[in-house]
């Protein structure tokens, strides 16, 4: 088949495979467009879970008649015009793909009017070349988008839609997330002609807790601790639930936003989990609604098709900033209980500090926490204290890093506590849920960790190997098999074929599926950790290993595979190390409590400190 340019409709349908996963994806893209247009009211009508109808109506700025046809074209946008705009993006959308992709897999109609126009205009695309037709219409200032019969022309995609109830639940969750991001916008959601959600706008300076309670429930509101934390151009606001009263139902509330964009970021989740670890059990998760504001130049949002992930240029700084912000609020909560009465609480006495000697954290002190009212009230919550001015954070992150390391090198002051033997294993407490905080990368593959003033070195390749083994070891259900686009066919000896047949059930539990004939074996599926490996080298080595075995246990095979996998990282970065440890702590909590040999090595600084003092 010769190389040729794809027809516009087919190209858009391919793009829709990334952008339009289900009806909720359509709702997300269209509502974000409404927010970018400055809408203060958005009405969303859904029929049959979004499969039959999705209608989004807003009172935004509207689209000019001359731009309606462009609005349905690929890579046409008003959000950016240059690379500089992309590197400092503040709008929710910017690629100009959503409307073109949605219109290629549905019957989409766009009706809009600007304040300068006397009449509205309607546009829709049809045909193989996606030609746009524009005609007059009746409509107030703003925009309405109707998406009919989603996936009507792609039956393979349509059959993967779930039940009406399931698809609407995904839409409901998307609207919850958006409503938490924009308190200043009224959002109404209806399903099959019935109003399901009404989120009224909160006026500037009003009580955001009212909408927070409507979305997250009064149980979260009663346990919520308000956060207000700032350092340089980083700001963290929001609420985190008291970990001492977190329930499984509350743990489902985990909403995080970066510059108003809803995110699912493992680095942020790890920082929050680490701050709460001392108060959470092994099977508990923190509950939070947090808003991170950062210089747009310091974050890359163009890393995921649906913009669910971001990449921070200074991931360590962001991680430590969030960790310290959440930790400080939890510590304040221990010192000052949440006031439930109407009497103002006296402000705590200011204690003089010596920052250089004490080696305090390099982030600015937070404003005083405003406790969240346990029930709805038209008056502001009582007991709050005026925010203290932010200390000047301009000397720079690099300069203040020295204070952190000085803190780690300091000999701890004696504590007035009952006599207890000094710990022989410095790194981790028995009930710890975290390896600690990553300070830096040493020799490209080791992470220097700090926990409770103790320093240790962690081998990242060994941690990665244990993580791969956990991912490969079957639990109650077999490991999920990932079909290969091109099956791998290998020639085997009679002995190797016999070993494979004996190990077939064990390999199936590991997600490895194969077929054999007289002299060949065809690998048809492998587990996810093997997808990025060189299977033409790994699989023959695995077959050779199996040929030497007499007993085929899935755990032993998983251990062998994990030891022989090639690492994806020749040079580890801070972000990669933090992500790896977050996964290890989640999937292999036993490694935190009892680290195996070769994984963790404590670093004793006392001889170095003594040598310095003896000079």
Curated annotation (Swiss-Prot):
Keyword DNA damage: yes
Domain of life: Bacteria
Keyword Magnesium among UniProt keywords: no
Residue ranges with Low complexity bias: 364-387
Pfam family membership, one: DNA_mis_repair
Region Disordered: start-end pairs: 363-397
MF (Gene Ontology): ATP binding; ATP hydrolysis activity; ATP-dependent DNA damage sensor activity; mismatched DNA binding
GO biological process, one term: mismatch repair
CDD domains per UniProt: HATPase_MutL-MLH-PMS-like, MutL_Trans_MutL
HAMAP family the record matches: DNA_mis_repair
Biological function: This protein is involved in the repair of mismatches in DNA. It is required for dam-dependent methyl-directed DNA mismatch repair. May act as a 'molecular matchmaker', a protein that promotes the formation of a stable complex between two or more DNA-binding proteins in an ATP-dependent manner without itself being part of a final effector complex.
Protein family (similarity comment): Belongs to the DNA mismatch repair MutL/HexB family.
Name of the molecule in the record: DNA mismatch repair protein MutL
Source organism per UniProt: Shigella flexneri
């Amino acid at each position: 088949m010769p190389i040729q340019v794809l027809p516009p409709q087919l190209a858009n349908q391919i793009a829709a495979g990334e952008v339009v996963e289900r009806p909720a994806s359509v709702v997300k893209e269209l509502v974000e467009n409404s927010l970018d247009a400055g809408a203060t009211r958005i009405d969303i009508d859904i029929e049959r879970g979004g499969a039959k109808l999705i209608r989004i109506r807003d009172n935004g700025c509207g689209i000019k008649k001359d731009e309606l046809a462009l609005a349905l074209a690929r890579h046409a946008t008003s959000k950016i015009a240059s690379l500089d705009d992309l590197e400092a993006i503040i709008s929710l959308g910017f690629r100009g793909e959503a409307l073109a992709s949605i219109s290629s897999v549905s019957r989409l109609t766009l009706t809009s009017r600007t304040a300068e126009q006397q009449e509205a205009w309607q546009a829709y695309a049809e045909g193989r070349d996606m030609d746009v037709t524009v005609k007059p219409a009746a409509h107030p200032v703003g925009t309405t988008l109707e998406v009919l019969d989603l996936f009507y022309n792609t039956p393979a995609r349509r059959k993967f839609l779930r039940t009406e109830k399931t698809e609407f639940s995904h839409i409901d969750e998307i609207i919850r997330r958006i409503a938490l991001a924009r308190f200043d916008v009224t959002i109404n959601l209806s399903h099959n002609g019935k109003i399901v959600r009404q989120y009224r706008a909160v006026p500037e300076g009003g009580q955001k807790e009212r909408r927070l309670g409507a979305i997250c429930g009064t149980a979260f509101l009663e346990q919520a601790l308000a956060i207000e934390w700032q350092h340089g151009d980083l700001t963290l606001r929001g609420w985190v639930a008291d970990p001492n009263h977190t329930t499984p139902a509350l743990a489902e509330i985990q909403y995080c936003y970066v510059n108003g964009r809803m995110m699912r970021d493992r680095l942020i989740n790890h920082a929050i989990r680490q701050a709460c670890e001392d108060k959470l059990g092994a099977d508990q998760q923190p509950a939070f609604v947090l808003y991170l504001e950062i210089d747009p130049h310091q974050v890359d949002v163009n890393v995921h098709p649906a913009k669910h992930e971001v990449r921070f240029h200074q991931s360590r700084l962001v991680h430590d900033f969030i960790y310290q912000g959440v930790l400080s609020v939890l510590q304040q909560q221990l010192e000052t209980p949440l006031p439930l009465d109407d009497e103002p609480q006296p402000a705590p006495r200011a204690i003089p500090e010596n920052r250089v000697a004490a080696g305090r954290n390099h982030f600015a002190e937070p404003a005083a926490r405003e406790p969240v009212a346990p029930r709805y009230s038209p008056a502001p919550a009582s007991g709050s204290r005026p925010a203290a001015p932010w200390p000047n954070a301009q000397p720079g992150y690099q300069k203040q890093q020295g204070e952190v390391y000085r803190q780690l090198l300091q000999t701890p002051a004696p504590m007035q506590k009952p006599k207890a033997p000094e710990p022989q294993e410095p790194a981790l407490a028995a009930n710890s849920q975290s390896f600690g905080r990553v300070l830096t990368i040493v020799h490209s593959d080791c992470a220097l960790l700090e926990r409770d003033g103790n320093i240790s070195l962690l081998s990242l390749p060994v941690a990665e190997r244990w993580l791969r083994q956990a991912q490969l070891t079957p639990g109650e259900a077999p490991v999920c098999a990932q079909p290969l686009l091109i099956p791998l066919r290998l020639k085997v000896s009679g002995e190797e074929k016999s070993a494979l047949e004996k190990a077939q059930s064990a390999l199936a539990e590991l997600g490895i599926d194969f077929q054999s004939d007289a002299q060949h074996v065809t690998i048809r599926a492998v587990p996810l950790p093997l997808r990025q490996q060189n299977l033409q080298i790994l699989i023959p080595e695995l077959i050779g290993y199996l040929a030497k075995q007499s007993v085929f246990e899935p755990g032993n095979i998983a251990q062998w595979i994990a030891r022989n996998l090639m690492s994806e990282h020749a040079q580890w970065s801070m972000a990669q190390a933090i992500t790896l440890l977050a996964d290890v702590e989640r999937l292999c909590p036993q490694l935190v409590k009892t680290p195996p040999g070769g994984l963790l090595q404590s670093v004793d600084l006392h001889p170095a400190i003594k040598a310095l003092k003896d000079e």
